Regions:
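Terminal accessory/targeting
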Residues: 1-244
Length: 244
């Protein structure tokens, strides 16, 4: 049976994040409605997502921020709040709210990398800098935040509606390697290698000259050439990495 979600209006952002968290993460089918009477008369599982709760409603209520009802990309007043033993964003303050923060707005902001579409200072490779991200400020860069919040959401929904069956998740580890340069000295071609040697000579960089020369004569390994070690690890751990 589908969970009925009451919202003030239906937007693409709503579809995206509810599809991700309810359908993909938890395996819960749902449908939206803007009809309060249909929602109130619905006897199955239901959730009201909006600014204010209705006095007469008997389902679950989650107080909403504005971002999922917007269409343009605009500056957000993203505040950090405490949640359990960690942090969250988009705090809400209605006592009837399922969570003390808008779990859907917060998840959308993070999973869409919304902040990267706003003006920011990029690094030398035109990339968004990690220290500017909201997850860095929340000290949660290395945690699967959306997965953890989805689990919390699922637990709350099942506590209220025991007939809900959550999808069992399976995981696999897929390492990725971003290889900007495969070699530091080797396979650069005669012209580039000669120019680099001339540069080292002009700088009187004896250590660099010696190291480069040893690598070119195959007396030392190229410092960037770690592929044999990577392949060894992949075989030992049975990994199937992706290279970029």
């Amino acid at each position: 049976m589908e969970m009925l979600i009451l919202v003030p209006k239906i937007t693409n952002r709503l579809y995206y994040i509810f599809e991700l968290m309810l359908k993909d993460e938890l395996g819960i089918d749902f449908k939206f409605t803007t009809d309060k009477d249909s929602y109130l008369s619905h006897e199955g599982s239901k959730l009201h997502y909006g600014k204010y709760p209705m006095p007469e409603e008997s389902g679950l209520y989650q107080q909403a921020a504005n971002i999922l009802f917007e269409h343009d990309i605009a500056d957000q007043d993203v505040k950090i709040c405490n949640y359990k033993e960690s942090k969250a964003i988009y705090p809400v303050f209605n006592e009837r709210s399922l969570f003390p923060f808008d779990i859907f707005a917060a998840s959308f902001y993070i999973i869409s990398r919304y902040e990267e579409y706003l003006p920011h200072v990029s690094d030398n490779y035109n990339r968004f800098q990690p220290q500017d991200s909201i997850l860095y400020k929340m000290e949660m860069m290395e945690r699967p935040v959306i997965n953890l919040w989805s689990i919390d959401l699922g637990n709350e929904l099942v506590a209220r509606y025991p007939e809900i069956t959550l999808k069992k998740k399976t995981f696999r580890f897929v390492p990725t390697y971003d290889v900007d340069a495969a070699w530091a000295y080797r396979n650069k071609g005669f012209f580039r290698t000669t120019l680099s040697l001339c540069r080292d000579i002009l700088r009187f960089d004896k250590n660099e000259i010696r190291y480069r020369w040893d690598v070119l004569r195959k007396k030392k390994m190229d410092p960037f050439d770690t592929f044999e070690y990577q392949i060894k690890l992949q075989k030992e751990l049975k990994l199937s990495p992706l290279y970029f």
